[in-house]
């Protein structure tokens, strides 16, 4: 954390949820991850920084707040690494560190659905960075699957966990084939599609839900579903972002369409 991170390039005053605005907007901001409004002011402040795009400060604030604040730190570090970190080695290190924080949090608070999801999110992004094949060989597949299943058991309306479960299954099927994916990793095409549709139903405003669904369709069906995937990307690109993370998702969708 010594190195100053790249600043969020799309600063927007509407993402600054000062004072009571944060609680008022909380349901919309956290429709995707079902994070409850923080009991501790320090954790609320960390989330305020996250939504504004002050990711490095959000990590520091979340780590200092401890307990539920760890979830902010993990999510902020992963969003930053995914979209704004330009060095591949640093990106992997950030994901790996965040996965460790999330693993500690879920061990300390096993009923925290978001901690399980964020562990899977960080580990999944790390796995994508080293290659899906290497991640599966190192046993990440089962860990990601189990963490997402636990998150959805604890919070059935967790849209981000639902779409991540669809994405996980799609990537495994694409890498090892349907039969091995089903027998070894419990990944099935029908289940992937079901979880994508669930996420769309739970959080239709989310750009990342549309993006991951589109990616999943390409992995599962290839060119046969390219038109559907393109339409989902177009819908993602047209969404009105509620915070910095969603703005980065929207910009990603737009760049993929260019």
What do the PLM-derived regions correspond to, one by one?
Residues 117-118, 163-164, 211-212:
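Conserved alpha-helical positions within TPR/SEL1-like repeat arrays
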Residues 210-216, 220, 234:
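C-terminal interaction module
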Residues 157-204:
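Alpha-helical adaptor scaffolds
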Residues 1-155, 160, 193-195, 202, ...:
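N-terminal alpha-helical interaction modules that lie
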């Amino acid at each position: 954390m010594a190195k100053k991170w790249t600043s969020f390039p799309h600063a927007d005053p509407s993402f600054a949820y000062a004072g009571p605005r944060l609680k008022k907007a909380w349901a919309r901001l956290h429709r995707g991850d079902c994070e409850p409004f923080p009991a501790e002011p320090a954790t609320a402040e960390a989330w305020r920084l996250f939504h504004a795009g002050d990711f490095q400060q959000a990590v520091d604030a979340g780590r200092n707040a401890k307990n539920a604040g760890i979830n902010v730190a993990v999510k902020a570090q992963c969003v930053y690494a995914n979209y704004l970190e330009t060095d591949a080695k640093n990106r992997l290190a950030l994901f790996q560190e965040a996965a460790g924080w999330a693993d500690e949090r879920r061990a300390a608070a096993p009923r925290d659905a978001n901690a399980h999801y964020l562990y899977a999110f960080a580990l999944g992004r790390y796995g994508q960075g080293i290659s899906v094949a290497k991640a599966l060989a190192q046993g990440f597949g089962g860990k990601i699957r189990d963490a997402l299943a636990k998150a959805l058991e604890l919070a059935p309306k967790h849209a981000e966990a639902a779409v991540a479960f669809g994405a996980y299954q799609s990537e495994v099927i694409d890498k090892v084939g349907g039969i091995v994916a089903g027998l070894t990793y419990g990944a099935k095409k029908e289940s992937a599609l079901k979880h994508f549709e669930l996420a769309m139903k739970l959080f239709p405003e989310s750009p990342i839900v549309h993006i991951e669904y589109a990616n999943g369709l390409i992995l599962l069906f290839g060119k046969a579903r390219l038109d559907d995937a393109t339409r989902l990307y177009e819908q993602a690109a047209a969404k009105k972002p509620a915070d910095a993370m969603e703005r980065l998702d929207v910009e990603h969708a737009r760049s993929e369409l260019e």
